[in-house]
Amino acid sequence: MTKEQASKLINDLRLKLNEWAKEYYVLDNPSVDDAEYDKTIHQLLDLENQFPELITSDSITQKVGGIVSDKFEKHTHKYPMLSLGDIFSWDEFINFNKQVAKVTGTENNEYTAELKIDGLSISLIYKDGVLQKGVTRGDGKVGENVTTNVKTIKSIPLSIPSKDEIEIRGEVFLGKKEFAKINEERLLNGDQLFANPRNAAAGTLRQLDSKIVAERNLDAYLYYYFNENNPINTQFDSINQIKNLGLKINKETKICKTLEEVKLYIEYYTEKRNELDYEIDGIVFKLNDKKLQEEVGYTAKTPKWAIAYKFPAEVKQTKLLDIFPTVGRTGKITYNAKLEPVQIAGTTVSAASLNNAEYIMAKDLRINSIVKVKKAGDIIPEVISAIKDEKFDLLPIWEKDVQCPACNELLEKTSTEVDQFCVNFNCPAQILRSLEHFASRGAANIVGLGGQTIKKLFEEKLITNIADIFKVEEHKENIINFEKFGEKSFENLIASIKESKNNSFEKTLFGLGIRHVGSKTALTLAQIYKNIDNLKNATYEELSSIDSVGEVLAMSIVDWFKIESNLQLINELKSFDVNFEYLGQAKNTESTISEKSFVITGTLSESRDYFKDIIELNNGKVIGSVSKKTDYVLAGENAGSKLTKAEELNVKVINEEEFFAILKGE
């Protein structure tokens, strides 16, 4: 390869990797998996090693990894948060150890072995015993200040038993069960699913709304300790010191005193990782002795004394038995793979989403071909590719459907979208999906009106649109004769339907199933327009000017209100007294501060309105003056006369950290 050819290829790879890095670190929505990213960056590294004169300071290989978002306040790290080099085989670990041995003088090096949590790196800064800041890694030099969100994580204490200035680093993550729960809720709400727990954790921690963060049970394992007043001799001592301060460490961390112990650790967790409650994508090995770490040193990007051993994705081969389409509530066609059952990452996989026709054609997937399958993020089944052997060429090339599988109408596809759509508003599959969506937990939340019950009611023609749900009481004699449905079940169903009439406007709006209007957008629209009539009369120009709406969504809303049957539906729902007025945000009546009164005084880390909003959303109240009936005085610096009066009346005075601890139930 000539230098000119290498230069062009290097530039192409850098552009591709920079785009992927933005998707991964900023948008939390990667378009490629880790294996593809790792393969491409190693290709770039190999080329730069061959042509070192082509290395530039802005190459992604010279960066730590992240990109700093402009959504949060910036924070410059006192000590750079470096990334780790990675390896994929035992031979590569042997080579890594030999490089370390050139400095230590022996290949019998002692390493700490730490499971590589698939999450988001975090730095916690404590001063005078109090958590001052929580900061993401960012680009390694500058991170994002996400302190308010970090304070909602139950495993991160707001105070520690030390007055020193201490920095503790670790990983914020979501457990497998919590990840599944969040994706289940997003599915019900019509939101895009998170691809893996790492994306979910990153997307959560970098939320602008800390109330959403608090609702998701983020967790954290800590592993790095910096304290200039109390230097630590080994990495394992560092972990024990973190534990002694009351922070959470991973109990699977071990010291490996020989290469044989390193190898056994790798083999054990390669086999057992699917049994853990959280996702890991490898193992981090660190030279245990801190003095030796400094002697071995650093590159501009990584420590030379640590390495990340990455697990290979478990890939299995199986037969692609069929490709079939399904119709969503908006008419979107999703293609699915029926697979010969195969065990992957601890579970049986017999189906996978194939997204859209372009996805299938790009991979040239054919029915009855042998395909490679893995689990993206060890969670979601994914068909990677077809095995193109001599039998493959004999199979017919797959062709996309041109008619809706439910109503036989011709499918349509716009030039700006990759998906096909059924545009028949009377399509039975769309109607059924829309009924299920309206009754779902994220929308009307009608208990007893699950998928099977709705399907039965629809098949019996007892309900044919959303408004018919509110006429179900008329069909009592038919419904109580359904299998597993008696008098009591019917009474409970009717009670839940009646209760749903009083739902918030945003829930009802979301339940209408307007294309692209998820639960968050529905809340934004409800807050701005206050009722359905104002929204109905909103122009495209008004809607598209809203930051979180944009042009595509604005057009979708305007188009929805142009359809006569949709206007009839709204009028009919109004006739059943379904609420279409914005009532304000719901309060958490089960909170630890519910019905408690607060006086806020002094200077706090956030504005007075910020704390007032939190208190009121948790069904507490903020009052202007201190009395004997006051439950708490939340006091910051320079609190003044209100603090003095609280002390005189023996009213409990709390600081900001104590406030969050009470809120978390500690």
UniProtKB/Swiss-Prot annotation:
Binding site for NAD(+): 34-38, 83-84, 114, 137, 171, 286, 310
Catalysed reactions, as listed in the record: NAD(+) + (deoxyribonucleotide)n-3'-hydroxyl + 5'-phospho-(deoxyribonucleotide)m = (deoxyribonucleotide)n+m + AMP + beta-nicotinamide D-nucleotide
The organism's place on the tree of life at top rank: Bacteria
PROSITE patterns tied to this protein: BRCT (PS50172), DNA_LIGASE_N1 (PS01055)
Cofactor(s) this protein requires: Mg(2+); Mn(2+)
GO cellular component: cytosol
Pfam families recorded: BRCT, DNA_ligase_aden, DNA_ligase_OB, DNA_ligase_ZBD, HHH_2, Nlig-Ia
Tagged with keyword Manganese: yes
Disulphide bridges, residue numbers: none
InterPro entries in UniProt: BRCT_dom, BRCT_dom_sf, DisA/LigA_HHH, DNA_ligase, DNA_ligase_AS, DNAligase_adenylation, DNAligase_N, NA-bd_OB-fold
UniProt keyword list: DNA damage, DNA repair, DNA replication, Ligase, Magnesium, Manganese, Metal-binding, NAD, Zinc
GO biological process terms held by the UniProt record: DNA repair; DNA replication
Gene3D superfamilies: 5' to 3' exonuclease, C-terminal subdomain, BRCT domain, DNA ligase/mRNA capping enzyme, Helix hairpin bin, Nucleic acid-binding proteins
EC top class, as a word: ligase
Single Gene Ontology MF annotation: DNA ligase (NAD+) activity
Keyword Metal-binding: yes
Residues of the BRCT domain: 588-666
The enzyme's E.C. designation: 6.5.1.2
Location of the active site: 116 (n6-amp-lysine intermediate)
HAMAP family: DNA_ligase_A (MF_01588)
Family: Belongs to the NAD-dependent DNA ligase family. LigA subfamily.
Record function comment: DNA ligase that catalyzes the formation of phosphodiester linkages between 5'-phosphoryl and 3'-hydroxyl groups in double-stranded DNA using NAD as a coenzyme and as the energy source for the reaction. It is essential for DNA replication and repair of damaged DNA.
Identification of the protein by name: DNA ligase
